[in-house]
């Protein structure tokens, strides 16, 4: 995961992309206002804050999109036609209360709304489960590049909200997936998100242990494990440090405890030639490479994130005759 929680970006795919809009009769039961009132409310929420309106506006517009059903394009149209009526999914008072909690207590908006747009999905999230980051979407793209033919069996270690598992399930609807999670709170959320993927089995436990019945059969394993060093913890922004689960973030003095365990079990768990693909901290590329190589994995490669940082590592289990 990233060290900091990314500001929600309203320019990304609408969170309602796969959900039909409510019928007109339902919309009429929702709070209504006019564009003029809504735009004035928006300016009021941005005014008088320690941070500049330019810094806060993306988050507020994201709240309006996901929490009220008013997307960025509609906001732009209301600038031209401010007297147009606007149906809201929440009242302005409710939205203001959420916004004030976000500003005053650093509670992530994703937790306040219980939803997080990620890739082309809308995931349920909540306290106790890590909020999926945009850069982790690249794990899916890398997996599809490195494993062009769907494997019979794949696994997601530390699935959290189930984001990676659900994305792979949609990409490979005829493959079987195994999603492992230690946290009971996260498993509860993942179970909800994975209801639409019946070919993914959710398992309780830590890393490789729940997968013992399938050791030697896994064609691909992906993982976004905790990798924050103890020394970095105090530097995390409050929304991360005070609200997101330490179990999904912290990984000992060097930040490599989880990656060390994943590397150690990979050769046994992967089928010959099976791939491991994981995310790591921005300065852990060399250390992760060393752990993977020492574990007996081959075909090591590193991959950059959207900012050009070495963020991901991939490797393969050796063929049968090399084990």
Question: Where would I find each of the regions flagged by the language model?
Answer:
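A short N-terminal interaction module
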Residues: 23, 28-84, 95
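Conserved AdoMet
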Residues: 62-142
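Residue-level signal for inorganic ion chemistry
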Residues: 63, 106, 136, 164, ...
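Conserved SAM/SAH cofactor-binding pocket of Class I
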Residues: 138-235
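Class I S-adenosylmethionine-dependent transferase superfamily signal
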Residues: 143, 168, 240, 262-266
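Mobile active-site "lid"/loop adjacent to the S-adenosyl-L-methionine
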Residues: 227-258
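Conserved Class I SAM-dependent methyltransferase catalytic core
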Residues: 253-316
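Flexible, glycine-/basic-rich loop-and-beta segments that form/coincide
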Residues: 319-323
